[in-house]
């Protein structure tokens, strides 16, 4: 391995790590970005680690070493950075072990199973002066960059209202994600941390949440088509939340994952002069046809300098995972601890989600700042106790 290459270990070789490899590391490598080398694959499931190592060897030319746990990984001298994709309840223990060993860390969202655990991760990163990047890919896609640009350009006027509704049905069992003590919460956290990040990215900071939650149908099936091997989920399946933004805007956020038959997928930001539908484009008062998302994206890309375009979309890659991986590698090599979605940014987005859970638990409005400061932990307390997060 060349001295200039960043030696990276992959911890957790399941589904989402496959996306990190196939949508991130591999296309960068194939574009000629050879500033890194994957040197280890780590998983308690050795077969998964071996399979991913074989896949990487096919395009990298060298096969990563396979290890069964992080302790064995940290005994290796040749690792500079670690990409961690594991169940939420393991984030803080594995990330902190790597950070304390002086390794840079790219950590899949959410930051941690609770904010108290997340704070411990932040403290370890600061203490050891290493890069901590949260794998938040949604905001990096061209459509989201274009939407933010259009809002900042004043195309919809002053943002005033947000309507974010995801209503659908999932009946199949999703493993650890269906258990609150392992996941920290349901789709309001797992997908919701993406959505909270996008709302903050487009509209601004969220300061207060009023929410309610329910579990209407906890039944899942390992064999969903046959209705065989039932499992009882312990996560919420329905969340309704009212949001108040720092700039005066208000929002409605709905997540429902067991609503039968009729789906609702609405993500719209209204301003004083128009609206942006995150799926359909820009709608303006007095104009019959919307500006399509493709047209908006083309306008945004045309507005960029060559340097800005290369910074946002290195090697012309438009995939958000490729961009976050590239940024992480460059930050580690340059000794620059600044990345777009660092631990603090990840903490802020997760705090919005946790404010929803806390408000629903307490049945009253909750200030996000108090949740961030760990002054409100009624929902999170049993999870902290389960994992002895103090």
Protein language model features and the residues they cover:
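Active-site loop of classical SDR/Rossmann-like NAD(P)-dependent oxidoreductases
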Residues: 16, 44-47, 314-325, 341
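Core-facing hydrophobic residues within beta-strands of well-ordered domains
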Residues: 36-38, 79, 159, 206
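N-terminal Rossmann-like dinucleotide-binding module
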Residues: 1-59
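Glycine- and charged-residue-rich phosphate/anionic-cofactor binding loop of Rossmann-like
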Residues: 34-40, 331-348
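Predominantly a Rossmann-like dinucleotide-binding segment in NAD(P)-dependent oxidoreductases
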Residues: 16-17, 138-233, 363
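Conserved SAM-binding strand-loop segment of SAM-dependent methyltransferases
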Residues: 63-70
